[in-house]
Structures are given as C-alpha cells and as structure tokens.
Regions:
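Hydrophobic transmembrane alpha-helices and their immediate loop junctions
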Residues: 1-222
C-alpha cells in the first residue's frame, strides 16, 4: 500500500464530495425553479454534503477506487461517483419533457462551470507562486469535468439517460424497469476500454480548451 497515493486519493475524494454537492444542488434548485418543490421540501436545495450522499456512489465506490489506486491498480487518479438522486415529480412540471431535460442537464452544466471557475482560481494561485494549491485546484477541475461527462452517459439513472428518455419519448414504466439495473450496468460499462476512453478523451479535450481560455499552460492530464 502506497500511503502517499492514499493521501493523494483522499484529497481527490474531498474534491469529489464538494463537486457532487454542487452537482446535486443544481438539480434540486433547477427542479424547484421549474415548479417542482419535492427536492426543496426534502432539504436538497442545499450545499450540505450530507443531504446529497449516496452510500454506494458517494462513499463505497469512490473510497474503493482510492484504495485500489494506492494498491497499484492505477485507478486512483480518475475518481468518480454519484450523489443521491434528486427526486422529481413530473406532475408538478408545466412542460414535463423539456423541464425534466433541463433539470437533468443542470448537474453536468454546474460541473462544467465549476471546472472553468477552478481554472481561473488556479491561475491566481500560480501568480501567487502557490504551486501546491494550484495543483489541488487543477485536479479538482479535472475531476469536475470527469463528473460532467460521466453523468452524461445515457444509462439510467445518470443524467444523460433523462435527456435520451425525453428525446425518444420513452415511457416512464420502461425507464423505471431499466433503472432497476442501471448502476450495475454503469459499473460494468466504465470498466470497458471504449467507454472509459470516450469519457477520458472528452475530459482531456475540454480541459485543454479551458486551459487556452484561462491562459494557463499547466500540465494536462497524464
């Protein structure tokens, strides 16, 4: 066990926890503004990480990735996870398909916004010659982009599946049936080289674009 990698992985986990909190809060806030106060009544329009935590997606899987990475599997650098799904009652929405899509996209959009904001913050740290802080913030930006593209996978109950469901007009009954096995499918698919390559390529490309936007020629993802 490499304890330096454990420490590095735990920093990544704390970054993930913060990013997931903003991600889920964005879903809840958007649902509230679209007319469904279900998540609001459950206290999900909040930046308190505890209310958004999912035992498997926020605790078990990410920490397992940290430990496996420290044991030499090479997994620890690209830590991913998910929060507790935000409840949305479509009957409260004025335009269910459109607004459900907006609610779904809000999470990944928040991650993209955070990735850009964090890179601007990294530029401040670089100017102040605070290289360690710059490294942490850049890594947090990378994790935010990973979360963005991971959640856009069209597999229930990830955000991309809501976009696909509303685009093709899938029935709620069919979606619910598929969702019962969704996270099993997700865990299997992210082990496939093609799927991980698509996520990593999208993340790298977007990260390089943000680097150019910010004007911060840092070392990209290795």
């Amino acid at each position: 066990m490499n304890w330096n990698l454990v420490f590095d992985g735990l920093i990544g986990y704390l970054c993930l926890l913060i990013l997931l909190t903003f991600h889920e809060a964005a879903h809840a806030w958007t649902a509230w503004k679209c007319g469904d106060d279900t998540a609001y009544q459950e206290g999900r329009v909040s930046l308190n990480p505890v209310v958004h935590m999912d035992m498997l997606g926020t605790v078990i899987l990410p920490l397992a990735v940290v430990l496996l990475g420290a044991a030499g599997s090479g997994m620890g650098r690209f830590i991913i996870g998910w929060g507790k799904p935000v409840p949305v009652y479509l009957g409260n929405l004025r335009k269910p398909r459109l607004q459900d899509t907006l609610i779904a996209v809000a999470g990944p959009a928040m991650n993209l916004i955070l990735a850009v904001a964090l890179m601007f913050l990294a530029r401040v740290f670089v100017s102040a010659e605070m290289s360690q802080m710059a490294y942490v913030v850049v890594r947090m930006s990378q994790i935010s982009l990973l979360l963005c593209f991971f959640n856009l996978l069209p597999i229930p109950p990830l955000d991309g599946s809501h976009v696909l469901k509303n685009f093709i007009g899938m029935s709620d009954e069919t979606y619910i049936r598929i969702s019962q096995f969704g996270f099993i499918i997700v865990i299997v698919l992210i082990q496939l080289q093609l799927v991980s390559a698509i996520i990593n390529y999208s993340t790298r490309l977007t990260f390089m674009m943000i680097e150019r936007l910010v004007g911060l020629p840092l070392v990209g993802m290795a």
